[in-house]
Swiss-Prot record:
CDD domains: IGPS (cd00331). One of its GO terms (molecular function) is phosphoribosylanthranilate isomerase activity. HAMAP family: IGPS_A. This is Indole-3-glycerol phosphate synthase. Belongs to the TrpC family. It is an enzyme of class 4 (lyase). PROSITE patterns: IGPS.
Length: 272
């Protein structure tokens, strides 16, 4: 599935560049305000929530018919940042959703399978504060991170293995995501965060992605050392999204038994 998605994304970028040349995106960005800081929102010392608007997924099919406005009203009160899934073919998302979410003043993560710097420009021109760069999918991670920073964004660099994390660190990532979902099988294992969290120096921001069904899962991941949790399917499919997120916020705010991660010096002493 992942190979099919990447192939589709490469074709998509070619078509997008024909319709909207990069020069137009650059011109649009020059007259835009600076985006709301993503690192400040998700790295403030408490366990933060990145709540996602996601209509569908390859593993679950259609997830929710709820509109963007309905969910953003909930997220505005309870989320520290918002992730907008923009892929249309597999997740039923769009850039219009990202642009629409800018009205609420939250830092926005454009979540897609980026394979070219063009999409970084597109994200910024649509109001994003951050983009998802997947280790092993984006072709030049260091260049992608630098391009984001040139455009006043800080990317979330997604990892699945210890090697991914070392590559992300070498590329200069400051926000590292551990995806608990296997992108090939779609199986979820929260223990992936448990195993990989010690590899992320304490000075950086660690985001645990996928698998939070309720407050118990959130408390477990907070205990593993996550600085932020990316939550999408649970609130989108919940009968009462606000009540669910209130329970999750309460659970992580009361989590006192958080595993300490290594500082930079300790990290290099441990793993050099």
């Amino acid at each position: 599935m992942l190979r099919d998605i990447i192939r589709s994304k490469k074709l998509e970028v070619k078509e997008l560049m024909k319709k909207t040349p990069l020069s137009i995106l650059r011109d649009d960005i020059t007259v835009m305000d600076e985006p709301v800081s993503f690192p400040a929102a998700v790295g403030g010392g408490k366990v933060s929530l990145i709540c996602e608007y996601k209509r569908a997924s390859p593993s679950m099919g259609r997830i929710s018919e709820r509109g963007l406005e309905e969910m953003m009203e909930v997220y505005q009160d309870l989320a520290d940042a918002v992730s907008i899934v923009t892929d249309g073919k597999y997740f039923k998302g769009s850039l219009d959703l990202l642009s629409g979410a800018t009205d609420y003043g939250k830092p926005l993560l454009m979540k897609d399978f980026l394979v070219d710097e063009y999409k970084i420009y597109q994200a910024r021109a649509s109001g994003a504060s951050s983009v998802l760069l997947i280790t092993g999918v984006f072709p030049d991670l260091e260049a992608g991170i630098q391009k984001c920073r040139e455009l006043s964004m800080e990317p979330l660099v997604e990892c699945h293995t210890s090697l991914d994390i070392f590559r992300a660190l070498e590329a200069g990532a400051e926000i590292i995501g551990v995806n608990n979902r296997d992108l090939e099988t779609f199986e979820v294992d929260l223990e992936r965060t448990h195993a990989l969290a010690p590899l992320v120096p304490d000075e950086l921001i660690l985001v645990s992605e996928s698998g939070v069904r309720g407050p118990e899962d959130a408390e477990i991941l907070a205990g593993y050392g996550a600085d932020a949790l990316l939550i999408g399917t649970a609130p989108m499919s919940a009968q009462n999204p606000r009540e669910l997120l209130e329970e999750i916020v309460d659970a992580v705010s009361q989590c006192r038994d958080r595993r300490r991660r290594y500082t930079g010096d300790e990290f290099f002493e441990q793993f050099a």
